[in-house]
Amino acid sequence: MIRIPLKDGGERRFRHRGTRADLGVIAQIFKAQDYSLRPLRRGRELESLYGRIVASGKAPLILDAGANIGASAVYFKRSFPASHIVALEPERNNFELLAENTAGLDVDARCAAIGSADGETSLVDPGEGEWGYRTSVGAAGERVSVLSCTRLVAESRAAGQVPFIAKIDIEGGEAELFSRHTDWVDLFPLLIVELHDWLLPRAGSARSFLRCVAGRDRDFVYRGENVFSIAYEWAGG
């Protein structure tokens, strides 16, 4: 258990298992500030956009795909308290901690994977620890639900939320996610994506993402392990 300081001066308890994976993700997010917008040249512009969405009476939508035990969701909620977060994690034990660590926040935690279309896939444990589970359509393994970005964004917009950030860290699953049905990309001012060619050499897992964003008017900024893809202009809600 750790205590995370909040902007209002309070603290929030955050439970972990003491494993290398859990401690690693906590260090990346809360100590190294992997998802902070402040180092970005356009960071203040994005923070200003967040303020305008809130001032309009709507909730900024943050989509957290590969939410693990909830560190990223809690970080985003601390940074953008008026946001609504949809957090997806397909591995059951991780999901249980995600649900516990985000209880009482405006976080819609779902035990599911993300993909280009609704359906099912297999969950595979390659032995990388609790942060390394992968999904594969043709592999043997536990069957898990897949929710499409198109569906999630449509549901959120129908509820009056405005796409703001999509954070995607899905251990190579980006190959399938960005392979088709990518109109939702244009609705998010900011994508934060970890690519996994370093983990999966010769698999081409980054290829579909690169093809998807190459033809769009977006900045492409590498920071740490993540790509920050920032739209030139905002598409609006």
Regions found by a protein language model. Give the residues of each.
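Phosphate/nucleotide-binding beta-alpha loop and adjacent structural elements of enzyme active sites
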Residues: 1-237
